[in-house]
Amino acid sequence: MSSSSPTGQIASAADIKQENGMESASEGQEAHREVAGGAAVGLSPPAPAPFPLEPGDAATAAARVSGEEGAVAAAAAGAAADQVQLHSELLGRHHHAAAAAAQTPLAFSPDHVACVCEALQQGGNLDRLARFLWSLPQSDLLRGNESLLKARALVAFHQGIYPELYSILESHSFESANHPLLQQLWYKARYTEAERARGRPLGAVDKYRLRRKFPLPRTIWDGEETVYCFKEKSRNALKELYKQNRYPSPAEKRHLAKITGLSLTQVSNWFKNRRQRDRNPSETQSKSESDGNPSTEDESSKGHEDLSPHPLSSSSDGITNLSLSSHMEPVYMQQIGNAKISLSSSGVLLNGSLVPASTSPVFLNGNSFIQGPSGVILNGLNVGNTQAVALNPPKMSSNIVSNGISMTDILGSTSQDVKEFKVLQSSANSATTTSYSPSVPVSFPGLIPSTEVKREGIQTVASQDGGSVVTFTTPVQINQYGIVQIPNSGANSQFLNGSIGFSPLQLPPVSVAASQGNISVSSSTSDGSTFTSESTTVQQGKVFLSSLAPSAVVYTVPNTGQTIGSVKQEGLERSLVFSQLMPVNQNAQVNANLSSENISGSGLHPLASSLVNVSPTHNFSLSPSTLLNPTELNRDIADSQPMSAPVASKSTVTSVSNTNYATLQNCSLITGQDLLSVPMTQAALGEIVPTAEDQVGHPSPAVHQDFVQEHRLVLQSVANMKENFLSNSESKATSSLMMLDSKSKYVLDGMVDTVCEDLETDKKELAKLQTVQLDEDMQDL
């Protein structure tokens, strides 16, 4: 009977199961419950399994331990699934074990269960974690276990059972270490529910509204509000350091980032944004506390003003309209851009902003200016009793250069760029004659203290071919920032009132009615088309010239007390353009015949301009004259052949004063050589009579009609000088600078009553010009 007894069959089945060594997951769970039942009848609980412990592994180990101790009932329960004939007995035995387990404590310790949950969470086995949690019995030991609750919340989120997730998170107060994970579960569950309801992904605003609508429960939140990823404690720490130091060092930033838990970039951006809000209080409401975006202003530029002159903008979007309604004599340079600026009666357009100035300021391409009666602005240079000269070295292209930036597209006169052409008008108070007069100038108070530069050690250059060599008698005054550049150009580009020179502009004859004070200005483009303005009324001593480029340029002839001169320029390469005042004899008529020659370029049509200043008590009439035909002007000039294009524009000047000058600015550059040709007027120019070296007085220029001799300037290459323009041996630089020096020079008696002054030399040889032998003595005319 033993062979047919159920006990023998169970034992044989257990032996077969142990020999095969195969158990399923369900059998493991059954064995787990059997172990729990066996513990109720006195079996010791199994030793804790090593970490991590899987549910099947734990059940298998428990079954083996119980089998070794002789627990035949546990082994029979594991093999009962394979025995069809013992189904009824095994089922009864299973119910008995389950009832025993409900009445007995948990077989595994809470720490063992928490370890298994953490292992499955870290491994990402959420399905196995769900089966393990389902297999755990109801026990008071597991109630309130935070690891178990966190695992249940994670499984509920994974399975999409969000109400159970919310119930778990709101029912238990979790530790702060678990807050970040549980907060993400809370928000992601809310986002997913909203996306399912709306049928579309959520944007940043939608997520923000959901966070406001469903705030975090206090069980997973410390109650400290976070503003733009910055907690209140972090923001307070940043504010405290900001009160002490607005510009913390990198070490302080790193320390603050460590304290607040923020990154170094967040700390730096917070300080930048805070400084920006303090500078612009009106934008505080529109700016975020710290959105991670860098500030628009660089920290290194804080508190430092830009002392360098600003070049003109090359934008051609529009032309600024200027309204001139003053009886003063200011010079306006039109700003290029979209801004519409209207100037008042006595203002200067300074880099696009209106600067109130006193009587008759002159603006010359810079941001430093001089105010005073009949003030002259020479970009930081004080020219009260001095004469400045523009010295640029050769080898310049035909483009206009302003502070090293090409201005071809600004001052170009091609017909395609002509978008709008306007002539500025100004009405005169009364019908008076148009006359011009410089007188003895007034010393102007400069905003920047200037230093006098003495010319020392300059060797004299002998004149060649019977020509005259130009030098100057008065020192140059410069500011403490050194020489400031003024736009200059080679290839016969012209200076108008010491301001901007440009070569492509063509101006047909200008006729002035001496009795009515009207001026008719007509301009022609490079392709022959002509823009003619209506006859306008000008004030006394004012002439307006307008360019054909989209950026109109306004010029005025200086009034009483103003000085025409150009400013020293350095940094360019080897060309020289100068503006010089020529004394005109008393009661002498000067017929200024302008010519331009030796121009090498492609399609450039230079204009040799001449401004003549006479006494205000006399008339200055420009007789109508003719220019070259547009077809002749528009011919392309070959690079290899210099072309002479004389302009038959004559001017008649009647003067009865000793302080009358004719400004000659028609310099032409001989490229490839160090010899600069300055063609004088072809008729009625005064011949300079040389005088003794130590003689000081007024020369008497002899006037004859056939004076057509061409004077040449011999250039002396010397070392470029530094900012303070001190002529010592330590101030030499690498680049070369062209200086003017001669044995004979033009008399400059317009600034003061004296005609000549002796220039001292210190017998120092600075440079040599090719094969020309340099002299050491300087003479006066």
UniProtKB/Swiss-Prot annotation:
What compartments host this protein? Answer: Nucleus; Cytoplasm
- GO MF term set: DNA-binding transcription activator activity, RNA polymerase II-specific; DNA-binding transcription factor activity, RNA polymerase II-specific; RNA polymerase II cis-regulatory region sequence-specific DNA binding; sequence-specific double-stranded DNA binding
Write down which residues bear the modification named Phosphoserine: 640
Q: Which GO terms describe its biological process?
A: anatomical structure morphogenesis; embryonic cranial skeleton morphogenesis; fungiform papilla morphogenesis; generation of neurons; inner ear morphogenesis; male gonad development; male sex determination; male sex differentiation
Q: Does the keyword Transport apply?
A: no
Q: What does this protein do?
A: Transcriptional regulator which can act as both a transcriptional repressor and activator by binding a DNA sequence on these target genes and is involved in processes like cell differentiation, cell migration and cell survival. Transactivates gene expression by binding a 5'-[CAT]A[CT][CT][CTG]GA[GAT]-3' motif present in the Trex site and a 5'-TCA[AG][AG]TTNC-3' motif present in the MEF3 site of the muscle-specific genes enhancer. Acts cooperatively with EYA proteins to transactivate their target genes through interaction and nuclear translocation of EYA protein.
PANTHER family xrefs:
HOMEOBOX PROTEIN SIX, HOMEOBOX PROTEIN SIX4
Which protein family is named in the record?
Belongs to the SIX/Sine oculis homeobox family.
Protein name per the record: Homeobox protein SIX4
Name the species this protein comes from: Homo sapiens
What is this organism's lineage? Eukaryota, Metazoa, Chordata, Craniata, Vertebrata
What's the encoding gene here? SIX4
